[in-house]
Amino acid sequence: MSLITRLLTGNNHLRIRALESLGKAGYSSHAKFSEHKPIERIRNIGISAHIDSGKTTLTERILFYTGRIAEMHEVRGKDNVGATMDSMELERQRGITIQSAATYTLWKDTNINIIDTPGHVDFTVEVERALRVLDGAVLVLCAVGGVQSQTLTVNRQMKRYNVPCLAFINKLDRLGSNPYRVLSQMRSKMNHNAAFIQLPIGVESNCKGIVDLVREKAIYFEGEHGMDIRLDEIPQDMRVESLERRQELIEHLSNADETLGELFLEEKPFTEDDIKAALRRTCINRTFTPVLVGTALKNKGVQPLLDAVLDYLPNPGEVENLGFIEKEGQDPEKIVLNPARDGKDPFVGLAFKLEAGRFGQLTYLRCYQGVLRKGDNIFNARTNKKVRIARLVRLHSNQMEDVNEVYAGDIFALFGVDCASGDTFTTNPKNNLSMESIFVPEPVVSMAIKPNNTKDRDNFSKAIARFTKEDPTFHFFFDNDVKETLVSGMGELHLEIYAQRMEREYGCPVTLGKPKVAFRETLVGPCEFDYLHKKQSGGSGQYARIIGIMEPLPPTQNTLLEFVDETVGTNVPKQFVPGVEKGYREMAEKGMLSGHKLSGIRFRLQDGGHHIVDSSELAFMLAAHGAIKEVFQNGSWQILEPIMLVEVTAPEEFQGAVMGHLSKRHGIITGTEGTEGWFTVYAEVPLNDMFGYAGELRSSTQGKGEFTMEYSRYSPCLPDVQDQIVRQYQESQGLAQPDKKKKKN
């Protein structure tokens, strides 16, 4: 059904008005949305922020004003419909966004692809993926909360991928909103060279409109849903302030932009176009952040934000995307991908998200170079598998529209492609080209999981297979010793959400056990081995001898395992070396000290011996097993634990209590800062000591404190913690020895 038909079903005032505005914009039907634009008329943007800053509401308003949806719904609205972008039932219930839905829309004849990203720290891999494929972003800040912990995380990720951004201070209508404080936090906490390009006309309940400092006009949003925009002179009582703020904007811009700086020094007058051009240049170079204001819920400031996206954020042709050509024994060669939409260069695309929906597996891709048409063949650069394109679709949250071709800069989806997120697709498998893969953190928490009813086993395995494919930070394995299935992820909330999705989407209620920490075992110092595996009792025997050293890797590499073949000559024939490595990696899955994986170890195979008949790969594999057991007996071992970066924010009067609790949990406080009655503590705390902290923090700060944590590194745990872990493991294995030593008086 075309947009026009949908608007005509029902005669309410709003739909007629929307129809008129669409008529003015010249939209005739969905055909307008799916036609291809020149590269200057395309924007790929993400909307990311801290939890509850109003990202999804803002996206909903953008879709409404651009004529993409005919009516608006609130995230936690009374009509229980939920926002368009929150398409998962669980998201609508909790009012948080878990998966980034991709949508495209049209504003002033420019095609905007929007990716709505989650703001919760447990879902950072979603944000990482979204930022990887964007050209620009809108950072949404709450006018009350300001720069919060997750805002800083998102800011770090934007820096990692060099994403230019605009800042939008939302929720001006909330009690206690203070956009000026938020701006000073952006400068102090995030080190942004930022300044207002708009000012609010009144805050809290008397928020009337905004002042545009570039055009020196006041903007009012009138009519139902703020669809009519009225420009007026700046109110008398705000003229002095807006002049001062405009001067401040020009000074900040002049520091970052040479062209404007010269005009500033020569004291020449500035035109509106000079400022706009300087804003665009500095924003794309990430040397200045324009700050806009508004309130999405009360429909103020959204249309000027859309204008700013077109004016200041880059199109796909202005962003440099690199591909890497792998060459054996050399560093990969970097090449710049050509973003032109002419289809002359071969197709290159990156899969950034997988979803298993009701239509089978859906893979979201971004096209970086060339053109892709229905019926083409493409190759997965990692597996070299060929894929034939049967259907190409563009996404609008969870509805889709078929297209016949996509060009560089487009975001689209394919069906039934077997791949992992971060895979590169090309038309020529021989050029060994790949985009750099997306950075994925290691999981830090694991929990036992089991379906409540045995009859749900099939659905349970379907759900697990789908979630592990979609989310590289979600792992699943079966522990043979305790006969438990374990899932591991980035935090307790991460795993709880998956447990609830199993119940809701697959009708399979599950029980989660107590959280367990992913410890690791490593060597303290180098240890030599010389092991002979010999079994020659008749028939074909087994014979293998290996000599070498196992040694610890430096602390920065303590999550890796290395195998080095240093053999010379034919004492250990080369065809048997993989057997030794295989045996080493098998034994590394489970240490003998506490049953956790080994890490941070280098296995150096230096020499050995073989038998002309009885040696085999299996014999050398078993020899590696024996050598590692020997090193367990002779070497000294220690246990590593994950250390988390924890950040706690609470009112000043609770500072003593909060710092006391962190010290009690073996935390090392790395820094503190305070602003206007609130303080923030940064600490490094072992994950093992962080369970149950949320409840303790709430009770000790009267519910006002909040904290976030993210994985930092592995480091050796305290001796008493190590003794306790070893003792628990030995008891569970039935190896505990009674203590025979008597105390002497």
Curated annotation (Swiss-Prot):
Additional comment: This protein may be expected to contain an N-terminal transit peptide but none has been predicted.
Domain tr-type G: 40-317
UniProtKB keywords: Elongation factor, GTP-binding, Mitochondrion, Nucleotide-binding, Protein biosynthesis
Species the sequence originates in: Drosophila erecta (Fruit fly)
CDD domains for the chain: EF-G (cd01886), EFG_III (cd16262), EFG_mtEFG1_IV (cd01434), mtEFG1_C (cd04097), mtEFG1_II_like (cd04091)
This protein's name: Elongation factor G, mitochondrial
Gene giving rise to this polypeptide: mEFG1
Disulfide bonds: none
GO CC terms: mitochondrion; nucleus
InterPro entries: EFG_II (IPR041095), EFG_III (IPR009022), EFG_III/V (IPR035647), EFG_IV (IPR047872), EFG_V (IPR035649), EFG_V-like (IPR000640), EFTu-like_2 (IPR004161), G_TR_CS (IPR031157)
Places the protein is found: Mitochondrion
